[in-house]
Regions:
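Helical "lid/coupling" subdomains associated with nucleotide-phosphate turnover
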Residues: 1-202
Length: 202
C-alpha cells in the first residue's frame, strides 16, 4: 500500500512544537507488508485476527478468515467469486488503508514537564488536507470505494494520528493519475481538465 502526500504538514493548532527531521513537501511511503495478496497475512497480523473480524461480515469466523488469507497469499491471482469473499477482500483493504495512513501521517503527543503540559508534533499534520484520491485494483473494482477510503481519515478514537479530517474523496478508476501528473509539468490546464473529467467523487 503506497501513500503519497503533497503538503507542508505544519501544525494546524497553536502551541504545538515540531520535533524530528523535516518532512518533505512531497512525501511517499511504501508499506510492503500491507497488501491484498502476498502480504495479506501481514495485514491480519498487524491488527490481530480478532480485531480483523470487525472489518468482515459477522458470519465469518477467525478460522475461515485465516484460511482465506492464507489461500490468497499463495494464489495471488485469485479473484473472489462470491459476495462474502469480496467482503473479506474489502475488509483487508480497509485495514491496509487505515494502517498505511497511520504510518504516513504525523502524530501529536502531550509531554508533561515542570511547567505543565506541552504538545509535540512528529511528522506531517495532514488534518486540513482537503482531498484524498484512491487508486488501485481493489478500489477500482469495489462496489463502495468510498467506504474503504474513509478508513484512512481522522479517527476521534485515535486523536494523536494526524490524518485528514474532512477530505473530499475521489477515485482514479482508470489508473490515469500518474499520466495527469506527468502532463501537469508541460500542460497544467489540460492536466486539470483531465483530472476533473476522470477523477470521480465517492
Amino acid at each position: 500500500t503506497d501513500i503519497d502526500s503533497i503538503a507542508k504538514g505544519a501544525p494546524t493548532k497553536g502551541g504545538v512544537t515540531v520535533r524530528g527531521l523535516e518532512e518533505p513537501y512531497v512525501k511517499r511511503t511504501v508499506e510492503g507488508d500491507l497488501g491484498m495478496r502476498y502480504s495479506a497475512p501481514s495485514v491480519v497480523e498487524a491488527i490481530g485476527p480478532k480485531n480483523m473480524l470487525n472489518y468482515v461480515p459477522k458470519e465469518i469466523g477467525e478460522k475461515e478468515l485465516i484460511n482465506y488469507v492464507d489461500k490468497i497469499s499463495d494464489d495471488v491471482k485469485y479473484v473472489p467469486n462470491n459476495k462474502k469473499k469480496k467482503q473479506i477482500d474489502y475488509g483487508i483493504a480497509k485495514v491496509a488503508t487505515k494502517l498505511a495512513i497511520k504510518r504516513h501521517v504525523g502524530r501529536i503527543e502531550t509531554v508533561y514537564g515542570p511547567f505543565g503540559a506541552s504538545h509535540v508534533q512528529y511528522g506531517k499534520d495532514l488534518t486540513k488536507l482537503d482531498m484524498m484520491i484512491g487508486t488501485g485494483g481493489v478500489l477500482a473494482h469495489s462496489d463502495n470505494p468510498g467506504e474503504i477510503l474513509r478508513h484512512g481519515i481522522y479517527d476521534s478514537n485515535s486523536p494523536e494520528v494526524l490524518a485528514p479530517v474532512e477530505p473530499e474523496l475521489l477515485l482514479d478508476k482508470e489508473y490515469i493519475l500518474s499520466c495527469i501528473g506527468l502532463l501537469s509539468e508541460i500542460a497544467p490546464d489540460k492536466a486539470l481538465t483531465l483530472a476533473k473529467k476522470h477523477l470521480k467523487k465517492v
